[in-house]
A protein has these predicted regions:
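Hydrophobic, aromatic-rich alpha-helical transmembrane segments
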Residues: 5, 29, 33, 37, ...
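Membrane-active amphipathic alpha-helices enriched in small hydrophobic residues
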Residues: 37-46, 72, 77, 190, ...
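Juxtamembrane helix-loop-helix connectors linking adjacent transmembrane helices
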Residues: 54-120, 133, 137-138, 171-179
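Transmembrane helix-loop-helix hairpins at the membrane interface
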Residues: 109-233
Length: 233
């Protein structure tokens, strides 16, 4: 009976994380910062309660050095690629974002040094490449685990993608009207789902969630800097 209660509570907690993910775009920035980190912690605890060990969560202490090595090498490559794309005429408009270009220097520094590395990269990797990938792999196997965690990662980006419509350059490039806007959202989901597969492979090869977290952070921070540069000239 106790085991059944524990498992029911764990699944209910994961349902709460999903509900938070669906509504988080409407929350104030400070609430999202705390909420993402709490959601990651709750998901990890739930997955652990459902039988996933530390290695399955990408949290085995002996693998973090490998995670840093893999993440450092791949993160540097990704950052260089994004920086290069941001300077090319055909792709530069995709980086424009009115919200980012409107940030003060102080706000931009906080975003790049705290919010993106912790709220986005660390929290999302602990959630999706830690808890979700670990649990899905444990229940469904390696291939299905990667597929499920990556698709859910893509869907996690629907609320912020909807919130960003009209402010980012992606919607402008895709064209106006409902078709262009939903095309931009669909493209965001597809791109982040593919990124989820890459992040999952990094976690598999390194054995640590640190690797995808470093690459995720490098990708987003470089993209943020590119968006700020595109908006300020």
């Amino acid at each position: 009976v106790e085991d059944r209660i524990r498992r029911t509570a764990a699944w209910a907690a994961l349902g709460g994380v999903a509900a938070y993910g669906a509504g988080r775009a409407r929350l104030p920035a400070a609430a999202r910062f705390t909420g993402n980190l709490v959601a990651a912690g709750v998901a990890l605890a739930a997955a652990s309660a459902l039988g996933v060990d530390r290695a399955g969560l990408g949290l085995a202490a002996g693998r973090h050095v490998q995670g840093i090595r893999w993440g450092g090498m791949a993160g540097g490559t990704v950052a260089a690629a994004v920086a290069g794309l941001a300077t090319i005429g055909p792709t530069r408009p995709y980086f424009a974002d009115e919200r980012i270009s409107a940030h003060s220097n102080r706000r931009a520094a906080v975003e790049a040094s705290l919010r993106i590395p912790l709220e986005t990269a660390a929290a999302e990797e602990l959630l999706f490449r830690g808890a979700v990938l670990g649990l899905a792999t444990d229940r469904l196997g390696d291939v299905a685990g990667v597929a499920v965690s990556s698709v859910l990662f893509g869907l996690w980006h629907v609320p912020p993608a909807l919130d960003a419509l009209g402010a980012s350059g992606v919607a402008d490039v895709a064209g106006g009207g409902p078709v262009g806007r939903w095309g931009a959202v669909t493209g965001t989901v597809a791109a982040t789902s593919v990124a989820g597969v890459v992040f999952a492979e990094l976690r598999r090869r390194s054995g640590s969630v640190v690797a995808p977290a470093l690459v995720h952070g490098a990708l987003n921070v470089t993209g943020f800097a590119a968006a700020r540069r595109a908006g300020t000239g």
